Structures are given as structure tokens and as C-alpha cells.
């Protein structure tokens, strides 16, 4: 919008829009290519509905730069009451995990730990990449319009020997929409389609994650 563009320019941010509708991964790939980052830069992928304390953010960036992480994630609170949180310390899903999650409202592939960890993957609401690593991965797979692009890129990163870190010293607040958890909603079918795409690319013989 015109107002958002003006506000972005006022704050010193670069605003880009060409009016095209793209998936989450494709939009981030487009942004990455527009920025012409150096190998030592970092690239942050985040949803528009997240918030983070500015002082904490500066410390987070310092931690990322000092780490050996190719992909870096933090603790995620679902609201500013700080009651419900996701550790983003996750194992790669098995074939039946997503279906069990929908039925029992439980994420089997998410381990709630409050300590520094090396998870299989972290959620796409907030991911920090070393620029060089994102480039080597060729960004997100644009076959995913929304959902599972985060799991996929972390899977490919692990196959290349890259390091994913979860650091709970830092956190964001993500006012996540829950439409995707409702059976037969538009988001449900989008999630299901992405799930099929993921398991076609990365078939697993585990029935559930452990």
C-alpha cells in the first residue's frame, strides 16, 4: 500500500511490491535476490505478525554472528501473556504425524525444551540464515506455496551438513492464526497439499516421529 511504502521509507526500510501473488517461500527468495547480500551478511525470514524487543534483537544478531549456525531459531510465544510457547526444537515429521496432530491437537514432532539445542528444523515464522547458507540452499523450494517450506529447507540443510540452532535465550511473539488447525478449512487443504509435496520429496518409512 502507499501508506506502508511511505512508512517503510521513513524508517529506512526498502519496500518492494510488483502486485503479484506469490507463495511464502517464493516471496522470500525474491527478497533475497533483490538485496545482493555478501557472504558475511545474514538474511531474516519472518512473518508480518511477529514482534521482538529491539534491544533483544541486537543481542540476538550478535549471537548469530558469533555462532556456527547456518539456520538460527528462537523461542516463540503465541501472545504477549507469555503463557503458550513453542520451543521450535523439532524433529522431522513422519508420514502420520500431521494427521495425528490434527486429530489429537498435539504436535508429536515438537519437543518442548528450554535449553540450547540442535533441532532438525525450526518454524518459518522467524528464521535467521547465514546469507552464504541460504544461497547454497538456493532458498526455499517454490513448489510449496505455504506450509512445509520451512521443514523442507531445514531437511535439505541437514543433508548438506549444515547446522540448525535453537536458542531460547531470545524470543519473539507470534500472533499466529489458527485457521490451519480447523478441519476442512482453506488453510487445512493448503497444509495437506504441502504435506503431500514434502513426503513425495522426502519419503520416510517411520510411522511416527520419536
Task: Kindly label every feature range from the protein language model.
Residues 39-51:
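Short beta-strand-to-loop acidic/aromatic patch adjacent to the donor-nucleotide binding site
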Residues 18-38:
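Glycine-rich, basic loop-to-helix element that forms the pyrophosphate-binding segment
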Amino acid at each position: 500500500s502507499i501508506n506502508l511504502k511511505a512508512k517503510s521509507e521513513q524508517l529506512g526500510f526498502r519496500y518492494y511490491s510488483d502486485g503479484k501473488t506469490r507463495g511464502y517461500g517464493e516471496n522470500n527468495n525474491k527478497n533475497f535476490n533483490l538485496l545482493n547480500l555478501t557472504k558475511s551478511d545474514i538474511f531474516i525470514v519472518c512473518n508480518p505478525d511477529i514482534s521482538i524487543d529491539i534491544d533483544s534483537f541486537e543481542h540476538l544478531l550478535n549471537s548469530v554472528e558469533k555462532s556456527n549456525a547456518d539456520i538460527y531459531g528462537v523461542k516463540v510465544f503465541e501472545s504477549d501473556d507469555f503463557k503458550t510457547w513453542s520451543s521450535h526444537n523439532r524433529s522431522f515429521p513422519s508420514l502420520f504425524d500431521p494427521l495425528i496432530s490434527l486429530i489429537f491437537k498435539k504436535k508429536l514432532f515438537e519437543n518442548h525444551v528450554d535449553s540450547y539445542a540442535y533441532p532438525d528444523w525450526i518454524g518459518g515464522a522467524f528464521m535467521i540464515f547465514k546469507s552464504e547458507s541460504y544461497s547454497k540452499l538456493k532458498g526455499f523450494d517454490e513448489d510449496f506455496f505455504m506450509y512445509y517450506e520451512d521443514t523442507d529447507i531445514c531437511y535439505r540443510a541437514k543433508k548438506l551438513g549444515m547446522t540448525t540452532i535453537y536458542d531460547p535465550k531470545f524470543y519473539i511473539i507470534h500472533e499466529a492464526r489458527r485457521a490451519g488447525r480447523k478441519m476442512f478449512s482453506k488453510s487445512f487443504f493448503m497444509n495437506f497439499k504441502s504435506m503431500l509435496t514434502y513426503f513425495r520429496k522426502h519419503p520416510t518409512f517411520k510411522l511416527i516421529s520419536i
